[in-house]
């Protein structure tokens, strides 16, 4: 229930069977206790306290640099400042990559309002305890960026960020967290006081129409990352990165996906000063900042990240099994919402099937998520109401959709970043005609036909061609069939041939190929001689 916090769990062996809670008001005062039991427990909190109570292994802090994680550990960058002699987005000296226990800065999600005059009633009359103006900076020319004359102070210069207490918060009990909340509360009020005084903007104050029962101040601290369980699958930087294992546009295909992310690897500072002038790296410099928007592409999150390795009856859709670097992107509310949806579906299926959570078939979870129009692989031009939506999503998870060729896109000299989401590379193009090369991959991988390659038969589909192994597989199965189903153009002496991978495919041709592969009649579309679109082909397969 709202305004209750978990303080312990009920266990039966390695199974979590219930949760013990206490009421907690907005001032942190703990009240009456409550007890809940359930067939499945879902811990969707930032802190993932239930992992601690249930002795479920978890990670906290930062992992060391590795092959899968070149940006892990202690790191200095110039993402938000210029460094003489360094190009933008550069990893700087003294970036040791050493692991530690630290977390990125926490804060409150403060909204402020421009009242247009300095004598408004929400101007702070005195600074909070411990106020130090050297911690802050503010440009008085800053203007409201959200409706109703309001500022998102969370996103302006990271002014409310405070390092050094994140890990302590996560590991603390609820009594100690009250004291930590005060530290952040005073720090963030100090930022607002600075804005109103030395910042030269006395017209700015807390909003009169928000958090009216809490002094117009947010109820909860913003925990950017908490515990991360040890799950059946651990998401790493290489699962998000476009280039480490991806195709230059998106992360690698993860067939067990139950959610997607589309946000850069973004970490606020982990160590360093608060707003003071500082050297670019080393002692006295801010450390831990990451902003890998150019290197991060749309990516997938497997079901195994929600499921503890050795415990039953509980899922973690927020404190998922991942590294610090991966969490720097996953930590967005739309992603956690999708993971929460997946957790709910998995829990319901486990109960209905009378199965352990780790034994629920991922395909069942995916099928239900697709019925609910959840996206499991990202496209810019495949709306949820598209007739081809479910088919394309399923086929994409099987690797049946031909990916883009990076050579076909002008990426040289440009930092595409999140703006690249408008590129053709992220489009499925459901209304465009499908080619034979594309259809060969759609059919072979979509029907999960084992590859069979006897030789390189076609001069226009040589080894190295994107469709090579799929065209050759169609040829091999066709020649073994009593009735050949793959058409090609042989030379007069039958020593070479053309497969025409760029030729459009008709509905009749597609049905003929599918019938041959499945060894049963597949009806052709209503207009068999018309060119088949990519969306129609997906539905047919």
Task: Enumerate the predicted regions with their spans.
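A short, hydrophobic/aromatic-rich structural module that often spans a beta strand
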Residues: 11-12, 466
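Residues that flank catalytic or metal-binding motifs in active/ligand-binding sites
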Residues: 2, 15, 102-106, 187, ...
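Short, composition-biased local secondary-structure segments
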Residues: 4-10, 307, 443-446, 525-526
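Feature responds to low-complexity, polar/acidic, surface-exposed segments characteristic
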Residues: 369-393, 401-511, 515-536, 541
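Flavin (FAD/FMN)-binding glycine-rich loop and adjacent Rossmann-like elements that form
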Residues: 2-6, 13, 18, 22-23, ...
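Conserved beta-strand edge residues that scaffold enzyme active sites
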Residues: 6-7, 65, 409, 488
